[in-house]
């Protein structure tokens, strides 16, 4: 049992708890350098004593914001080996940009042309902002050149076609809810 006690005491300095031991930041930096350098075979394995000193000095020198910036890429590098786990979020990100931004744009303009009761409950400021410029754009374009094809009414007609059924259902639901409450129609 005495051997185990000695091993437990010595493992605190050389084992995995070395990264969390409070004596000095240089031991933590050395443990991190060993952990990273062993798996990747990087440049830190060539001179193990120099990186521990260099690793400790900038960490104590830089403000906490710089430390957090340094820690983030390390986490990405450690997780870089598990790229299979990161593929679904990347596909979600790539699908968000072209597809969902367009659908959100058309949805906002479609909800502006449709039932105001449903759009006012979700967001108050965005329908007012979106309906103001769209209405003024379509009026100025119609007044300036009536023979020219107008992209704004075409887009709004497309949105009305896509969201007409949804807006109609929302209007009916609102109508029925007002009837059940006993309030007169507005």
UniProtKB/Swiss-Prot annotation:
The protein depicted here goes by the name Protein VCF1
Q: Where is this region: Disordered?
A: 1-156
Compositionally biased intervals (Basic residues): 31-43
This protein's UniProt keywords = Methylation
What Pfam families does the record point to?
Answer: FAM104 (PF15434)
Ranges of biased composition (kind: Gly residues) = 1-16
Q: Where is there biased composition of kind Low complexity?
A: 108-123
Q: Which residues carry this modification: Omega-N-methylarginine?
A: 4
The UniProt entry's sequence similarity note says: Belongs to the VCF family.
Q: Which domain of life is it from?
A: Eukaryota
